Amino acid sequence: MTTQRSPGLFRRLAHGSLVKQILVGLVLGILLAWISKPAAEAVGLLGTLFVGALKAVAPILVLMLVMASIANHQHGQKTNIRPILFLYLLGTFSAALAAVVFSFAFPSTLHLSSSAGDISPPSGIVEVMRGLVMSMVSNPIDALLKGNYIGILVWAIGLGFALRHGNETTKNLVNDLSNAVTFMVKLVIRFAPIGIFGLVSSTLATTGFSTLWGYAQLLVVLVGCMLLVALVVNPLLVWWKIRRNPFPLVLLCLRESGVYAFFTRSSAANIPVNMALCEKLNLDRDTYSVSIPLGATINMAGAAITITVLTLAAVNTLGIPVDLPTALLLSVVASLCACGASGVAGGSLLLIPLACNMFGISNDIAMQVVAVGFIIGVLQDSCETALNSSTDVLFTAAACQAEDDRLANSALRN
């Protein structure tokens, strides 16, 4: 009987709800820190191992995902998706810009073990641009070893375009390697409850329970900014497109797409739900069959918010000054980073080091910021995915309805 129960228990742990397991890890970590401070400090090793695993897998993840995405792009797909693509890009940038404003209005700080004395902050936008350009020409092996994500992106894009001219066997190999790395990332993230248990325990034992308020404030800023985008920014963009009350469409998409995405925590997994909603709205099949999968890849407003808010929280913690041009550049960089976060649970968190590179923040400190993101990720990742996925179908519907209105008005004039 014992041998039959063990596999069942292991299967439940391996395939159970990650959100529930992280919640359990949070609660157990808080309890251990409250009961025994020495024991809580000792289990901090679990958190250290988890962060180390993230540091190891993040650079190769970015390289393979971007390279495979570009290499396997299909040629000759003729669909009328330019307005939708424009809305995707504009919405993602608007979300990053809103996150910058929100972060300046409600500044947050993090509890990081490294001091600001190890940081060499850039003096302004000129130095930031110089650092970006120099990072772009880094040796690819050196970029992978040192976590230079800007250099990794440049090499991934270049190799991706080069491989588009390769044969199908090569493209399939790159795609298989990308899937293998994604599997490794999922494997690491399955250990998130244990890692977060160690991180929460050691953090509370070291800094006290006041740390929870810092995380709570950060979570309020993140979720508040996502609500602002979902209920203010997106409706404005939809109104600009369809020129009528956008809220019936906005609320429908949040209810019938966002709720599902909140629990699945994957834009890719929510694609069938969005397809069904598009069919229910009588949208053009040739359009939404392309725009919905495309949106699951590049329409990442929630990810842009997460990257921007957590990066500026780290910058604020380390006392690095940020001028307006640098903040605007961060919005652009965060928007570009967000496009690489598709289909991976916690993907936006793993791309935070790229944005942190702008401010001279080391990879070690950046991965501590990622760890903080995992601690609050129970709600953050769910809200982020709900915003991302519901916006896919929202912008598709807005563009299709605007095109239908244009054709109808054109027919009336004739």
Curated annotation (Swiss-Prot):
It catalyses: L-serine(in) + Na(+)(in) = L-serine(out) + Na(+)(out); L-threonine(in) + Na(+)(in) = L-threonine(out) + Na(+)(out). It is a multi-pass membrane protein. Residues 2-15, 67-83, 164-179, 239-299, 353-414 are cytoplasmic. It is found in: Cell inner membrane. Keywords: Amino-acid transport, Cell inner membrane, Cell membrane, Membrane, Symport, Transmembrane, Transmembrane helix, Transport. The chain crosses the membrane at residues 16-36, 46-66, 84-104, 143-163, 180-200, 218-238, 300-320, 332-352. Signal peptide: none annotated. GO terms for biological process: serine transport; threonine transport. One of its GO terms (molecular function) is neutral L-amino acid:sodium symporter activity. Residues 37-45, 105-142, 201-217, 321-331 are periplasmic. InterPro entries: Na-dicarboxylate_symporter, Na:dicarbo_symporter_sf, Ser_Thr_transp_SstT. Coiled coil: none annotated. PANTHER family: PROTON/GLUTAMATE-ASPARTATE SYMPORTER, SERINE_THREONINE TRANSPORTER SSTT. Involved in the import of serine and threonine into the cell, with the concomitant import of sodium (symport system). Belongs to the dicarboxylate/amino acid:cation symporter (DAACS) (TC 2.A.23) family. This is Serine/threonine transporter SstT. The lineage of its organism: Bacteria, Pseudomonadati, Pseudomonadota, Gammaproteobacteria, Enterobacterales.
